[in-house]
Amino acid sequence: MEQPIPVTRQSFDEWIVPTYAPADFIVVRGEGATLWDQQGKSYIDFAGGIAVNALGHGHPAVKAALIEQADKVWHLGNGYTNEPVLRLAKQLIDATFAEKVFFCNSGAEANEAALKLARKYALDNFANKPGQQGEKNQIVAFRNAFHGRTLFTVSAGGQPKYSQDFAPLPGGISHGIFNDLASAEALITDQTCAVIVEPIQGEGGVLPADSEFLHGLRALCDRHNAVLIFDEVQTGVGRTGELYAYMHYGVTPDVLTSAKALGGGFPIAAMLTTTKYASALNVGSHGTTYGGNPLACAVAGTVLSLINTPAVLSGVKERHQWFLEGLADINARYKVFAEIRGRGLLIGCVLNSDYAGKSKDIIQAAAQHGIIALIAGPDVVRFAPSLIISQHDIKEGLARLAMGIEQVCRKAKS
């Protein structure tokens, strides 16, 4: 066997399209909540691959599922079905409101499918219907949301920095103010086919929806015959301490999108819905080559069965408290956070006015001390670690984070 091509961080700059600016080290191995780089330096992982590695790195049962399926069949295409995809569909149906599932490969694809379904359902059921004024194809989304990078989903996202360079954008999308029901009510009409919302805005700053807001959206969608879509790409599969965040609120969507943690690190996504809405997508109306891939579904089935247990879900809530206590101690020392918010193990630390705009500085300094974290905009440090991270790793990670914060504080005062 030929020796692997030697690579360094500089190789990224030479060979990769620069849509990202990764850290200056290369991770080569992971186990549990710990990562190691090419030089053997260890890092506690508070990022979880952006809320993906829900069971940490190298979980033995997940690895075994992948190897077992790899010895059977890898890929078939959508002209044939397979056992893992059917079993995973049944698991999701049994665990949620859903009656039908569409599998794809990423959160953006799942949201794209959800929005297409909503427009198709409206076309099939309301076009030329007596009393219907105008075409029913408008989509209501919310400012500072994030729904993916396809042209359709990035247009729904409500963050111009991600969409403004790709005009002309798809039309028929308007954006209300998140957590402002009056703003939504002014936009949702009988011409609205869908409302798409995150129960917690992840990229938008780890901002949870108010219960009254989501209940109000449900009522408005019912009144105007609009499809209510919950984007649970980041909040789903145990991240908040329930299998899906809608379960906290007692608000059931018509369509739910899931990705990230669903595969525990293996790319897979799903759109969940009921028979009523699924009927809008018939043979040939939508599709994907890799969706329902046997390898992905075998892994996801194992991930879902491991997470959807009382022990793991209650453990997420317990770990949330461990984080809050540790972060409060850090803030008592350094006074950098104005607010700590989120649910379960999706946590956002909002920087106060003295440190506004320094979220990237903090995570870069923290990395020097062996902790990997995320940002959610310039003013929010975000954590989305493994759902089964140990108390020891949380304490050690927060200690390393504190060293990074101290470094930023010293620099700010010098």
From Swiss-Prot:
GO MF: identical protein binding; pyridoxal phosphate binding; succinylornithine transaminase activity
InterPro entries recorded: Ac/SucOrn_transaminase_bac (IPR017652), AcOrn/SuccOrn_fam (IPR004636), Aminotrans_3 (IPR005814), Aminotrans_3_PPA_site (IPR049704), Class-III_PLP-dep_AT (IPR050103), PyrdxlP-dep_Trfase (IPR015424), PyrdxlP-dep_Trfase_major (IPR015421), PyrdxlP-dep_Trfase_small (IPR015422)
Domain of life: Bacteria
Top EC class for this record: transferase
Record keywords, A-Z: Aminotransferase, Arginine metabolism, Pyridoxal phosphate, Transferase
Location of N6-(pyridoxal phosphate)lysine modifications: 260
Pathway, per record: Amino-acid degradation; L-arginine degradation via AST pathway; L-glutamate and succinate from L-arginine: step 3/5
GO BP annotations listed: alpha-amino acid biosynthetic process; arginine catabolic process to glutamate; arginine catabolic process to succinate; ornithine catabolic process
Cofactor(s) demanded: pyridoxal 5'-phosphate
Catalytic activity: N(2)-succinyl-L-ornithine + 2-oxoglutarate = N-succinyl-L-glutamate 5-semialdehyde + L-glutamate
Enzyme Commission no: 2.6.1.81
Family the entry assigns: Belongs to the class-III pyridoxal-phosphate-dependent aminotransferase family. AstC subfamily.
The protein's role, per its UniProt record: Catalyzes the transamination of N(2)-succinylornithine and alpha-ketoglutarate into N(2)-succinylglutamate semialdehyde and glutamate. Can also act as an acetylornithine aminotransferase.
HAMAP family for the chain: ArgD_aminotrans_3, AstC_aminotrans_3
Protein name: Succinylornithine transaminase
Source organism: Yersinia enterocolitica serotype O:8 / biotype 1B (strain NCTC 13174 / 8081)
Phylogenetic placement of the source organism: Bacteria, Pseudomonadati, Pseudomonadota, Gammaproteobacteria, Enterobacterales
